[in-house]
């Protein structure tokens, strides 16, 4: 495993699971079975003392414990995330698992993804977990408590300083969970900046094709890994067999997908930002049309923060948000676009746009979240421009 662990991430994505291959197939086969035969030799029938600890990547028994597709998926993720990866049936199932593991009395969390707050509400109902703002005084937190930091944050796409929040948490004996969904491997390594647990909604960039649900936790501590496995067996929150295979297939192209989408996004942000900053644009020009429709734009690349280039040295993510001049513009723009699907979620190969209020009623009703895909960026630019122009003509 050492040569693979020392390899480039693109190589790891293709070979980190080679040692788990049980067949001669080059492409990993789809294992759908939920049960596996015991040995025929009675002498090999040994009652396990600890099925989790004794799993060797081959002695499968029941898929709620371990399954071939998910095990290979987790092997690649462990290499890419630089920690022990555990997969779940959804991102929120993964977050629930993290909070079950740590069992904090208090949690400090920002606005971010509304689903995370729903999980916190369930935990609070069961355990009395208290929720505080992300920037609450450090003195509120105690030993074993949690800061849940989403960066870049949903839906804006802006970033927070992971190291700053790690120091805050650790100064109080608390833990830092980083939701790095918007900053997949290749863009951001939260462990490098002090994260204790890294969390991803794998439905996004790990799946990458808008066709699977998945959640992932990565940890450094062996005792946490074992407890996560044990809890997953007890709660039955495993990723499905087919989803495990789909996730493995998709990880093979993770780096090239994320790079292309991030480059596309950077070019579009640069164009829109320049247009919005042009003084006294000529009526009818691109700059005039953009300014007539857009009021504000959010993306990590627009932040002038000295720490950000270190935290995200290879790009700032393919998701950004725009605030339009009025709510009617925001509701109408998606219907004017040809190459952007009006749908929720993000991280797929196709570009998406969402009037975000449909998913999260608490956000600004003039806000649209944009997830950039793998199309040619100039086609996306032309599509946005024609849609903006159409809105100005109808207003």
Labelled PLM ranges:
Residues 2-6, 10-19, 81-292, 298, ...:
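Conserved PLP-enzyme active-site core in the AAT-like
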Residues 2-48:
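N-terminal amphipathic/basic leader segments beginning at the initiator methionine
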Residues 15, 19-20, 281-368, 372:
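Conserved C-terminal alpha-helix-loop-beta "cap" of PLP-dependent enzymes
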Residues 28-30, 35-101, 112-124:
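Conserved N-terminal alpha-helix of the aminotransferase class I/II PLP-enzyme fold
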Residues 35, 41, 219-224, 251, ...:
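Short loop segments at secondary-structure junctions
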Residues 73, 228, 329-333, 380-384:
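Hydrophobic side chains in well-ordered alpha-helices
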Residues 83, 105-108, 114, 122, ...:
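PLP-dependent enzyme catalytic core of the Aspartate aminotransferase-like
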């Amino acid at each position: 495993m050492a040569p693979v662990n020392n390899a480039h991430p693109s190589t790891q994505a293709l070979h980190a699971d080679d040692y788990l291959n049980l067949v001669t197939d080059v492409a990993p086969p789809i294992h759908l079975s939920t049960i596996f035969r015991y040995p025929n030799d009675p002498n090999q029938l040994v009652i396990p003392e600890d099925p989790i600890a004794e799993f060797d990547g081959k002695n499968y028994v029941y898929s709620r414990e371990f399954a071939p597709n998910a095990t290979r998926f987790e092997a690649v993720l462990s290499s890419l995330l630089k920690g022990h990866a555990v997969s779940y049936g959804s991102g929120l199932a993964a977050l629930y698992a993290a909070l079950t593991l740590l069992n904090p009395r208090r949690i400090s969390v920002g606005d971010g993804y509304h689903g995370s707050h729903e999980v916190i509400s369930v935990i609070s109902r069961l355990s009395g977990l208290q929720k505080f703002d992300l920037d609450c005084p450090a003195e509120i937190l105690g030993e074993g408590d949690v800061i849940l930091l989403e960066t870049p944050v949903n839906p804006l796409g802006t970033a927070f300083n992971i190291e700053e929040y790690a120091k805050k948490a650790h100064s109080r004996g608390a833990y830092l969970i980083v939701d790095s969904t918007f900053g997949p491997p290749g863009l951001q390594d939260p462990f490098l900046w002090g994260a204790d647990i890294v969390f991803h909604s794998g439905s996004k960039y790990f799946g990458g094709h808008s066709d699977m649900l998945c959640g992932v936790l990565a940890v450094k501590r062996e005792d946490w890994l074992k407890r996560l496995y044990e809890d997953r067996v007890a709660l039955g929150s495993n990723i499905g067999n087919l989803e495990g295979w789909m996730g493995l297939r998709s990880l093979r192209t993770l780096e090239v997908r994320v790079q292309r989408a991030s480059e596309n996004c950077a070019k579009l942000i640069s164009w829109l930002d320049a247009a919005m900053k042009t003084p006294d644009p000529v009526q009818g020009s691109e700059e005039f049309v953009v300014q007539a429709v857009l009021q504000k734009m959010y993306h990590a690349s627009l932040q002038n923060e000295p720490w950000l280039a270190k935290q995200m040295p290879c790009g700032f993510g393919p998701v950004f948000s725009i605030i339009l001049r009025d709510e009617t513009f925001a509701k109408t723009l998606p219907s004017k676009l040809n190459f952007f699907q009006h749908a929720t979620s993000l991280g797929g190969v196709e570009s998406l746009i969402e009037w975000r209020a449909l998913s999260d009623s608490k956000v600004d009703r003039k806000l649209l979240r944009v997830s950039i895909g793998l199309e040619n960026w100039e086609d996306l630019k032309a599509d946005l421009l024609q849609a903006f122009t159409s809105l100005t003509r109808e207003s």
